[in-house]
């Protein structure tokens, strides 16, 4: 019995220990919710401790006599790392909690839930450990100084401090020798560089000298050399006898022995450091150079390919700065003033220069009437606001003056015709410029577009235009820069009626003008004007924007006295249903836009406008005919897409007579027209956008598309064809040959809907620059790219290299997008809805843009649960970024 007892005791212990182990591991799963809550609570405590330490450091480092201890910095870095890990962990907590079952005591995937639960426990322990280490008796120590001249500056706000920290970290990186700071005038570049200068006085003796030089537009090499020499102890009478090269040698001999920082403020062109005598900063010598400029091009010429943009302030940051300038007493003098002050601050659009000047001007205004008047002036004629011309517009004008040539300046000023904060389509803007004669249309469409985009790029890099972040095809103008452009257009305010811009201000009638003969440009777009009756002598008028109004009728007299009108835009006047015959008197007209109007018949006089090169008749739902268009023999761009207009053989013949035509957009809804039009190589080369609609199977069983090198956008809707084939040329000898080179080299957007006979879209292999693909409501589509057909065409073509967005809607038969995983180096969004048979996406863990999220939207929650991922790594890569979203139809 004794022997048995001695054996049973160790067995009990083993069982007990094994049970405890199972309980511990089981707790990773069934205590997951509780453990996550504990982790979140511990993280809040750690953040609070981090905040206390940072606040102590800011107080002690403020004097510039203290620097933080290394152990404190190590602890802060560890906290940042654990915070990032915590955020990553938290992103997938909903998925993990949904995976639990049996009231949280089990999981649909024990392995994944166990791993996640264990990570939660391990992180909880690490957070608690870091929190306990965050008690410091001392956080900083005394530090020596570099040779720095501190420069006074006005108090700054949180947003500017964040920008400072970012710039400082970039400059102080070991591999960084030179930092470029660029941004529009008045955005705070000099303030930022000043704070960088002063910060060097608070760090240790890593640098021997910090040199500040104001360069400006008129600076010379000699002037820069003199400023540097004064700082390093050179100069004297003998310098007047030396040339620039000899002085450069002297400066170089001094600086090569010292670890220096050179800060160059306000440079307008490349500063040749070698010519000045400054050793080029490198990792080896440990020296630093930072500069500010208004032009990103200058950054490139200085050898900085990744400069830091100094941006306008966010709305709340703008309000903080504006409050600081106006003062608490003024803001508190009447309960309505803070609300009005916010409206005034918004007019500045985050530009610190404007916030400072306007804030100071309003600091003594303590009545509601004064604030309301300020809003009225800033809205209707900002140039009349106190300080606007002298302190803001003159400062910004330096950027305009620095533009190279009158062409660039004219193109810039043209952008001020659009309303405040208006998104301007780049290609549409270039079409205006071509029609105005800024760009010579005889150079050909491709050259014109390239030149136009080069001008836009230059203006963006000069911070005079802003490129839209989401949609790179749009630009806009900062409101204060727009005021500067309007001021310049009016000869610096001397001829305010030379360029009349009242866009988007709620006008109901054409404004009164003292002398119409002096008016060159008028923009009344985005208003509520209904009738245009007046007739005026507009001998100098070249541009008239009336788009996006409520115009119902235009009198016959209106067009009689505009002999030099070149651009007329009447688009998006949806109540406009007729035009007077007197349109024929606009003999100089080159650009005419009637899109989105309800005009049912074009006046015969329109066909007499022989100078017309751009005619837009898109989305005209009532237009019946354009017979006679061949009389516009100089026409180069013609928009017909989405109009009620029927494209028949007689119209095709007229289009073939337009010898100068370069761009056309149209709809094809008849097989009788499709074949002859697609056999006309000259017309095919002009097609930029085309929609095939209502082509029935009995008439077009196979749609054969020729090479369309200029095609940008393609729609195929409600068609019955069974297959789409591609031919490389339009000649009959090659009609059935498979293409070996891209046939749609510029095609970027494809829409296919309600084509119930199609089985696949393998022809998309020959659209290498496709960025957007939407396929919907086509019940027989089984493959986007058929593996079998793809091998027949070319085994070497990899599809969708440029694809950014993929939408798949109600494709009940869709089984595959592609047979194997693709790299998708540009893909950002996949949206799948009502595609029940699609079980696998062509993704692996390396698909998508490196370091960026690829969002998968799905319409049915059960679909995402059935997706078969390539492997676990792929699932972990994409499942957390999958989101339910029902498509609005």
Swiss-Prot record:
Lipidation sites (S-palmitoyl cysteine): 4
UniProt KW keywords: ATP-binding, Cell membrane, Coiled coil, Hypersensitive response, Leucine-rich repeat, Lipoprotein, Membrane, Myristate, Nucleotide-binding, Palmitate, Plant defense, Repeat
Membrane topology for this entry? Answer: Lipid-anchor
Which residues does ATP bind? 183-190
The parts of the chain that form a coiled coil are 29-58
Report the record's Gene Ontology biological process terms: cell death; defense response; defense response to bacterium; plant-type hypersensitive response
Give Gene Ontology CC terms.
Answer: plasma membrane
Which Pfam families does the annotation name? LRR_14 (PF23598), NB-ARC (PF00931), WH_DRP (PF23559)
- Show the disulfide pairing: none
Q: Where is the NB-ARC domain?
A: 140-444
Upon changing residue 6 to A, the result is: Affects plasma membrane location
Q: Where in the cell is it found?
A: Cell membrane
Outcome of mutating residue 799 to S, per the record? Answer: In rps5-1; impairs defense reaction against pathogens
- Impact after mutating residue 266 to E: Induces RPS5-mediated plant resistance to P.syringae
LRR repeat spans: 518-539, 540-561, 564-586, 588-610, 611-633, 634-656
Record's family?
Belongs to the disease resistance NB-LRR family.
Q: How does it assemble?
A: In uninfected plants, interacts with PBS1 through the coiled coil domain. Homodimer.
Task: Report what the protein is called.
Answer: Disease resistance protein RPS5
Naturally occurring in which organism (per UniProt): Arabidopsis thaliana
């Amino acid at each position: 019995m004794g022997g048995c007892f001695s054996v049973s005791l160790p067995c009990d212990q083993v069982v007990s220990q094994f049970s405890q182990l199972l309980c511990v591991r089981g707790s990773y799963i069934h205590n997951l919710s509780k453990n996550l809550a504990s982790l979140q609570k511990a993280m809040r405590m750690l953040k609070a401790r981090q905040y206390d330490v940072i606040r102590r450091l800011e107080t002690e480092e403020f004097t510039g006599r203290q620097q933080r201890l290394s152990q404190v910095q190590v602890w802060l870095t560890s906290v940042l790392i654990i915070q990032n890990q915590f955020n990553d962990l938290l992103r997938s907590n909903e998925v993990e909690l949904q995976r639990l079952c049996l009231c949280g005591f089990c999981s649909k995937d024990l392995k994944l839930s166990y791993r996640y639960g264990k990570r939660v426990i391990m992180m909880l322990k690490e957070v608690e450990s870091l929190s306990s280490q965050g008690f410091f008796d001392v956080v900083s120590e005394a530090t020596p100084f570099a040779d720095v001249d501190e420069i006074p500056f006005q108090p700054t706000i949180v947003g500017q401090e964040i920008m400072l920290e970012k710039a400082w970290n970039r400059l102080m990186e070991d591999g960084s020798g030179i930092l470029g700071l660029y941004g529009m005038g008045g955005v705070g570049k000099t303030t930022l560089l000043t704070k960088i200068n002063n910060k060097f006085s608070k760090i240790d003796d890593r640098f021997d000298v910090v040199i500040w030089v104001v360069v400006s537009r008129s600076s010379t090499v000699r002037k820069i050399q003199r400023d540097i020499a004064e700082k390093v102890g050179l100069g004297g009478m003998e310098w007047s006898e030396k040339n620039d090269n000899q002085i450069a040698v002297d400066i170089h001999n001094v600086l090569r022995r010292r670890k220096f920082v050179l800060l160059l403020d306000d440079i307008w062109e490349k500063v040749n450091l070698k010519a000045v005598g400054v050793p080029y900063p490198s990792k080896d010598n440990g020296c630093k150079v930072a500069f500010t400029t208004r032009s990103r091009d200058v950054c490139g010429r200085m050898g900085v390919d990744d400069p830091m943009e100094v941006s306008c302030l966010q709305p709340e940051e703008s309000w903080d700065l504006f409050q600081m300038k106006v003062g608490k007493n003024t803001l508190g003098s009447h309960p309505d003033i803070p609300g009005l002050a916010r409206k005034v601050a918004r007019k500045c659009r985050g530009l610190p220069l404007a916030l400072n000047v306007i804030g100071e001007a309003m600091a003594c205004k303590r009545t509601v009437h004064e604030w309301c008047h300020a809003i009225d002036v800033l809205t209707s004629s900002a140039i009349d606001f106190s300080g606007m011309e002298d302190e803001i517009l003159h400062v910004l004008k330096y950027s305009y003056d620095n533009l190279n040539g009158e062409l660039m300046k004219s193109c810039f000023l043209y952008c001020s015709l659009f309303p405040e904060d208006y998104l301007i389509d780049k290609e549409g803007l270039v079409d205006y410029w071509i029609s105005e004669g800024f760009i010579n249309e005889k150079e050909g469409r491709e050259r014109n577009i390239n030149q136009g985009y080069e001008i836009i790029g230059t203006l963006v890099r000069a911070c005079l235009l802003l490129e839209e972040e989401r949609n790179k095809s749009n630009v806009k103008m900062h409101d204060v820069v727009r005021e500067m452009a309007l001021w310049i257009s009016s000869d610096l305010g001397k001829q305010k009626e030379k360029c009349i811009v009242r866009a988007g201000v709620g006008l109901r009638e054409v404004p009164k003008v003292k002398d119409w003969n002096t008016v060159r440009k008028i923009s009344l777009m985005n208003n509520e004007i209904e009738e245009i009756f007046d007739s005026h002598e507009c001998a100098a008028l070249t541009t008239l924007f009336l788009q996006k109004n409520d115009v119902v009728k235009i009198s016959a007299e209106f067009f009689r006295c505009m002999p030099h009108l070149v651009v007329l835009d009447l688009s998006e006047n949806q109540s406009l249903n007729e035009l007077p015959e007197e349109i024929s008197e606009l003999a100089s007209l080159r650009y005419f836009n009637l899109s989105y109007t309800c005009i049912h018949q074009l006046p015969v006089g329109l066909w007499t406008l022989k100078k017309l090169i751009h005619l837009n008749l898109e989305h005209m739902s009532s237009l019946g005919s354009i017979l006679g268009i061949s009389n516009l023999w100089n026409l180069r761009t013609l928009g017909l897409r989405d109009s009620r207009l029927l494209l028949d053989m007689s119209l095709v013949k007229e289009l073939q007579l337009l010898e100068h035509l370069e761009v056309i957009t149209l709809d094809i809804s008849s097989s009788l027209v499709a074949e002859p039009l697609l056999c006309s190589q000259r017309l095919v080369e002009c097609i930029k956008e085309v929609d095939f609609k209502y082509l029935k199977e009995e008439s077009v069983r196979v749609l054969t598309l020729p090479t369309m090198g200029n095609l940008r956008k393609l729609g195929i809707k409600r068609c019955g064809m069974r297959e789409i084939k591609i031919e490389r040329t339009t000649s009959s000898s090659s009609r059935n040959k498979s293409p070996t080179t891209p046939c749609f080299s510029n095609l970027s957007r494809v829409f296919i809907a309600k084509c119930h006979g199609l089985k696949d879209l393998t022809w998309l292999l020959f659209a290498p620059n496709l960025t957007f693909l939407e396929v919907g409501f086509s019940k027989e589509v089984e493959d986007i790219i058929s593996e079998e057909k793809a091998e027949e065409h070319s085994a070497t073509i990899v599809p969708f290299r440029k694809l950014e967005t993929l939408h798949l809607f109600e494709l009940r038969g869709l089984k595959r997008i592609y047979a194997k995983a693709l790299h998708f180096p540009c893909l950002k969004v996949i949206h799948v809805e009502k595609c029940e048979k699609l079980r696998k996406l062509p993704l692996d863990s390396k698909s998508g843009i490196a370091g960026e999220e690829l969002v998968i939207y799905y319409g049915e929650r059960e679909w995402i649960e059935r997706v078969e991922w390539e492997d676990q790594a792929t699932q972990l890569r994409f499942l957390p970024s999958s989101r339910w979203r029902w498509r609005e139809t």
